[in-house]
Amino acid sequence: RDSSTSRGLGDVYKRQLTHRGRIETFAHLGLTCFALELMPRISRAQSMDILSSQSNLAGYKAVIEAVCKLPSAVPMMMTAAGTIAPAKALILGAGVAGLQAIATAKRLGAVVFASDVRPQVKEQVESLGGRFVEVKSDENFETAGGYARETSAEYKQKQQEAVAEQLAKTNFAVTTALIPGLPAPRLITKAMLSAMPAGAVVVDMASSAGGNVEGSEDGKIIVINGVTVIGNSNLAASLPASASPLFAKNILNFLDTMYNKEEKSLNYNFEDELIKGTCLCYNGKMIHPSFTGA
């Protein structure tokens, strides 16, 4: 099937070793394969950005999952019997998932705090009603593509101190921090969990990549030092009626850039950064830098 084309969300960064043999098999079969999670972060690619469309839903669902496990109400309630204070939320990572988590928690009535290694996102956090937990540093931890990069040991120490201080006052937290090609950064330790209020909940969206929370397990809900820790890195799958149409539209928009209406076939222009950035194998060879080391 030399003319066959495969597309999908293969998670090449996270599972390169696991998937390498599979991609080699695809190449030997003459398949042309694309990994859409490698889509360049440029304006022309926004309608094809699977990571963004799915992460947006995941950020929303993470807050819903956390709130459902809380033993208390989220918004402030003033009644004749007394006043219920609003819940405090902490969102770690202000990418697409994190920003949606901030917006969702705010709409539910929580007092929302957020932290990110990229100080540039402070304005976005505040525009959604969140309060930015800033860690002062002269270092730049943002890649050219807008993703977070690995931080220095000094910064990690400062960040951990700031997060620990805020966590001690937090009723529920959502962690979304991922670094392409590397294990998820450890943001919350078991000691930090033990300092959280009774009944606190943490959702670790990076659990399949090693986890932002010490002790979290992907696909499991466990209690660590009195805190309910939900490990779930595939929350969008729990919203199939919303996730599937967006996923399908992303793929359709991507295929549309390659489709030649006159010839009624797909033409691969490897000068196009969308094609070059996402194609794993072509013409019997593995060509993406993730595999070739180029």
What is the meaning of each model-derived region?
Residues R1, E142-A173, A177-S194, N232, ...:
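A structured beta-alpha segment of the ubiquitous adenosine-cofactor-binding alpha/beta core
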Residues G8, K169, P197-A198:
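Alpha-helix C-terminal capping/helix-to-coil transition sites in glycosyltransferase folds
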Residues L17-S43, A184-N234:
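Rossmann-fold NAD(P)-binding glycine/threonine-rich loop
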Residues E37-A80, S207, V213-A294:
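Adenosine-phosphate binding glycine-rich loop
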Residues D2-Y13:
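Single conserved hydrophobic/aromatic residue that forms the stacking wall/gate
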Residues P75-Q166:
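Glycine-rich phosphate/diphosphate-binding loop of Rossmann-like nucleotide-binding domains
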Residues I23, V63, A101-I102, K122, ...:
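Generic hydrophobic/aromatic pocket-lining and core-packing "Φ" positions
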